[in-house]
Regions:
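Domain-scale signature associated with acetyltransferase and cell-envelope carbohydrate enzymes
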Residues: 1-141, 158-161, 165-167, 174, ...
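Regulatory activation segment
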Residues: 151-157
Length: 230
């Protein structure tokens, strides 16, 4: 059944489907909860997920999102994790260590296994719509520990937010560090380390540290046959 038919059917009987999804998601043998995080799940499907953290935090999951074996660990207060509609997340970990942080995924974004998103010290991780993350990807807005200038004791490694644009494909084993910006339509090569803002849209980023290696690209999850070169 395609997305339009699913949407039409569930919206016609929204109250019933909302009750059924909510009942399923709350079964303790399906998902585990600990703490007082406010959760809004709508018409979403969760299985094998673990949600822990303190009061004053919010988890919002959009309609038709599917989450399998995900971990939400939200400490502090005033934090929000928002998963957009039609997202797919499997074996993903969402970690917030302090207060005033946000992690958000745009609609139709997919996290495909062993992925960690960690925000701290009031920073944000923002991922746009229609993005695709391969396995073993790490996004961190900070270092979790303090790096100091020896002579003064001043801390020199502040945390900084991460922003990923729309329609970005991130390959396997990629690390995205604090302060990174990635423009719309980009592709990040496997094993790359992103350390800065990349403002050029529709390019391939690759390397350690990553740099622009190809311009004027686009991508699709479909496997299109390559035309034979005569």
């Amino acid at each position: 059944m395609d997305k339009q038919k699913v949407t039409a059917l569930t919206q016609k009987h929204r109250s019933l489907f909302r009750f059924l999804f909510r009942l399923h998601n709350r079964f303790p043998f399906v998902n585990r909860r600990k703490g007082r995080i406010r959760t809004q799940a709508g018409l979403s499907y969760l299985k094998g997920c673990r949600i822990t953290g303190g009061a004053g935090n919010t988890l919002i999951i959009g309609d038709y999102a599917r989450l399998k074996n995900c971990v939400f660990h939200i400490e502090g207060t005033g934090n929000t994790v928002q998963i957009g509609p039609w997202c797919y997340c499997e074996n993903a970990e969402f970690w917030i260590e302090d207060s005033g942080c946000t992690i958000s995924l745009g609609a139709h974004t997919a996290l495909c296994g062993n992925i960690q998103l960690a925000a701290m010290e009031g920073t944000n991780i923002t991922v746009g719509e229609d993005c695709l993350f391969s396995s073993a990807v790490r996004l961190r807005t900070g270092d979790s520990h303090s790096l100091l200038k020896k002579s003064t004791g001043e801390r020199i490694n502040p945390s900084a937010s991460i922003a990923i644009g729309n329609h970005v494909w991130v390959g396997t084993n990629v690390t995205i560090l604090k302060g990174v910006r990635v423009a719309d339509g980009c592709v990040v090569g496997a094993g790359s380390l992103l350390t800065k803002a990349y403002s050029q849209p529709n390019c391939v980023l690759a390397g350690v540290p990553a740099r622009e290696v190809k311009l004027d690209v686009d991508w699709t999850p479909e496997r299109i046959p390559v035309r034979e070169i005569l």
